[in-house]
Amino acid sequence: MPTVTDLIDLFETEATRERPEADRPDVGIIMGSDSDLDVMSGAHEALTALGFEELTDYDDPPDARFTFETWVVSAHRTPDLMYTYAETAADRGLDVIIAGAGGKSADLPNMTASIAYPIPVIGVPVQEKSVDSVIGMPTGAPITAVDAGKSYNAALSAVQILARRHDELVDRLRSILEDRRLDVATVSMRLHERGTATFREEREDE
């Protein structure tokens, strides 16, 4: 069973290794507890839809050019792990971090943003009561944040940041937007043709 020290050693060791850029994770997804995963899985969904693959073994990276990693890093229970994760982020190849936390003391996004600076950190309040904690950063300590539970949007924002350097991601972002536009058109026509009562019945049966 791995210990916190094992994970700290892993991050520190990985930070010293020379790997091709394509073999390093571009986006890091972290959360304070595995109970946050249902909310944070939206980021996984968005990145996967945009052609990213999840890196689960640093020594055996996916074939995809763009990858992400996922970890549980608690600001309160494992502050040393959080510090090491954020401090080594740049040297491990990360360009953006998506950090989610719940409760009224949702400190993981804020602390990560402070330590990983200048790497951009996108905070995801897992619950409504976490919003004030996540966005409450003082002047000079920036963090970007989405609304409660919107980890999907956080991932889109992360890819928008990466797209400034990678034109192919611009095309992927435009494609996913066009898919959503088509969804609206399809639903609109279906509602019009079926009528409100029938449309609602069919939607309830789906």
Predicted regions and their residues:
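Haloarchaeal acidic low-complexity proteome signature biased toward cell-envelope/secretome components but also
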Residues: 1-24, 180-206
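Glycine-rich phosphate/diphosphate-binding loop of Rossmann-like nucleotide-binding domains
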Residues: 15-68, 72-75
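Short, ordered loop/turn segments at secondary-structure junctions
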Residues: 33-34, 73-75, 102-103, 126-129, ...
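Short glycine/serine/threonine-rich phosphate/pyrophosphate-binding segments
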Residues: 36-40, 79-81, 104-111, 131, ...
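Glycine-rich phosphate-binding loop
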Residues: 80-125
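Short, acidic/small-residue loops that bind anionic groups at enzyme active sites
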Residues: 112-149, 172
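A charged, well-structured terminal subsegment
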Residues: 150-189
